[in-house]
């Protein structure tokens, strides 16, 4: 089931590649396209609204708002066209005001205004503007919903190419619609001849200077406020669509340059971490440490995942170990015992071990425990950071060695000693963590293979060697030293915090 492998060296999965052949199908992608280059260690946070894709989404939302504004403004003026209409308004208003000999009937003028005089029919301009606003609204709404759906197809260069092309087409059409709308709602914009050759311009000029002003004539001869707002919104949409094209192309270029591996479309989950000791040291250096005393210098005793354990963090000791082979039972379910026995008792145990014949290595490598719930790693306590009963006695000792701070010079001296001890404390914790992580990894591996397999003996042998290493005087001295340093650092921290509070 598992091939026999040695744990004395790094795993085979790490190291420089031995060849540069074609990539296998395990990775799902090949070399970058020709002409592009990928920049390592340059993550692109595309989930932010300040990124190019975020700017595209924000501009699309702005286009939707402007389209709604255009629809509302233009729709509010349709009553003049369809309620009284060009025929009704001009038939009753213009025909009655100027007489039939000037324009003839109202119906003939309504057609003459739009066709005979070569102008733009206001009803047609309103309809064209509303149609383009609705088309732009639906297109940008579809693109925005697709971008927010977080599907794989919308996170590619092809999608933003479609955004670029569609936005460019909409910008061109919307520009034409805005110009046509201005020509339709403003009669003076389409009159270039004089009064004698442009009766409509003459009519509007006489209407402005007359004391009697028909409201229908005034509507068709002037630009209403809502019509002006609609025209301005049309040109703003053209500008926003051009910006969408720019940021869409910028998104495509970033994907091409940095590669999909460096593009982060979603925010990484935030992991809750404990108090950062180094951050506290910086605050102490700046004189701004006002943290609570209970935020100790705890160093996590929970081992990291075996998958995340560093592959080069530990080199197993020789098979001889720190003790003779007869001093330790082959069973792996014995919990760790502290080295509290007297030297005489230790010598007696050593003599008994010499008298007994040594066990064969294969037998010593056996570990009879099969229930993972009884794993001794769940019950052992290595170096701990919790408050113990002996801390109360240690506080008196540290209080005599490090009394309360009374000057800035003493505070600086405490801080320098704190920095030195902190480095040593973290180094000890890292060394012990590497051993514990390796033990947990081996324990899980022993649970996953059968005792009759050949690799079980090798794994169990290394597991027992690590257990011997944890019982060694060197490991126990490091464990005790880390505990002493932890209490010392905690005491110095309280002294510095108390001094900072008094000084204000």
Swiss-Prot record:
Q: Name one GO biological process term.
A: snRNA transcription by RNA polymerase II
Chief place of localization: membrane
**Ranges annotated as biased composition (Basic residues):** 361-370
- Membrane-related topology note: Multi-pass membrane protein
Any single GO CC term annotated in Swiss-Prot or TrEMBL for this entry? bicellular tight junction
Q: Which residues lie on this side of the membrane: Extracellular?
A: 81-123, 184-227
Q: What is the effect of changing residue 383 to F?
A: Decrease in phosphorylation and loss of regulation of TJP1 binding. Loss of phosphorylation and loss of regulation of TJP1 binding
MARVEL domain: residues covered? 51-253
Any domain commentary? The C-terminal is cytoplasmic and is important for interaction with ZO-1. Necessary for the tight junction localization. Involved in the regulation of the permeability barrier function of the tight junction. The second extracellular domain may also be implicated in the permeability barrier function of the tight junction.
Q: What does this protein do?
A: May play a role in the formation and regulation of the tight junction (TJ) paracellular permeability barrier. Interacts with ZO-1.
Report what the protein is called: Occludin
Report which gene this protein is encoded by: OCLN
């Amino acid at each position: 089931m598992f091939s026999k492998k040695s744990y004395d060296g790094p795993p085979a999965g790490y190291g420089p590649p031995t060849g540069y052949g074609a990539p296998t199908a395990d990775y799902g992608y090949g070399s970058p396209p020709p002409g592009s280059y990928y920049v390592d260690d340059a993550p692109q946070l595309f989930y932010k609204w300040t990124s190019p894709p975020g700017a595209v989404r924000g501009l699309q939302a702005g286009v939707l708002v402007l389209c709604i504004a255009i629809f509302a403004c233009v729709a509010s003026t349709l009553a003049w066209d369809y309620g009284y209409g060009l025929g009704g308004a001009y038939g009753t208003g213009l025909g009655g005001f100027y007489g039939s000999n000037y324009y003839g009937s109202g119906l003939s003028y309504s057609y003459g205004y739009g066709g005979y005089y070569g102008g733009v029919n206001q009803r047609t301009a309103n309809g064209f503007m509303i149609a383009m606003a609705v088309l732009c609204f639906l297109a940008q709404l579809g693109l925005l919903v697709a971008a927010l759906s977080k599907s794989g197809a919308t996170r590619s260069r092809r999608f933003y190419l479609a955004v670029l092309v569609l936005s460019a087409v909409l910008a061109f059409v919307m520009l034409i619609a805005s110009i046509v709308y201005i020509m339709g709602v403003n009669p003076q914009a389409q009159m270039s001849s004089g009064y004698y050759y442009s009766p409509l311009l003459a009519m509007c000029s006489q209407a402005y200077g007359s004391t009697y002003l028909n409201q229908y004539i005034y509507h068709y001869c002037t630009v209403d406020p809502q019509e002006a707002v609609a025209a301005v919104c049309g040109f703003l949409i053209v500008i926003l669509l051009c910006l969408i094209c720019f940021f869409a192309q910028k998104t495509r270029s970033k994907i091409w340059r940095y590669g999909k591996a460096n593009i982060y479309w979603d925010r990484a989950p935030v992991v809750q971490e404990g108090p950062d000791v180094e951050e506290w040291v910086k605050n102490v250096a700046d004189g701004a440490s006002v943290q609570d005393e209970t935020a100790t210098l705890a160093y996590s005793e929970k081992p990291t995942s075996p998958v995340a354990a560093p592959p080069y963090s530990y080199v197993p000791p020789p098979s001889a170990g720190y003790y003779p082979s007869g001093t330790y039972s082959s069973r792996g379910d014995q919990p760790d015992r502290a080295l509290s026995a007297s030297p005489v008792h230790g010598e007696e145990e050593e003599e008994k071990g010499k008298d007994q014949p040594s066990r064969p290595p294969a037998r010593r490598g056996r570990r009879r425990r099969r229930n993972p719930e009884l794993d001794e790693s769940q019950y052992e306590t290595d170096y701990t950071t919790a408050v113990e009963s002996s801390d109360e006695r240690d506080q008196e000792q540290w209080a005599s060695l490090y009394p309360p701070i009374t000057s800035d010079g003493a505070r600086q001296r405490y801080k320098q000693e704190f920095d030195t001890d902190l480095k040593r404390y973290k180094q000890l914790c890292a060394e012990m963590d590497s051993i514990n992580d390796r033990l947990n990894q081996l324990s899980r591996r022993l649970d996953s293979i059968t005792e009759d397999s050949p690799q079980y003996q090798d794994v169990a042998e290394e597991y027992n060697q690590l257990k011997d290493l944890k019982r060694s005087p060197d490991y126990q001295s490091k464990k005790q030293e880390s505990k002493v340093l932890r209490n010392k650092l905690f005491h110095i921290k309280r002294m510095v915090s108390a001094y900072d509070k008094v000084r204000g």
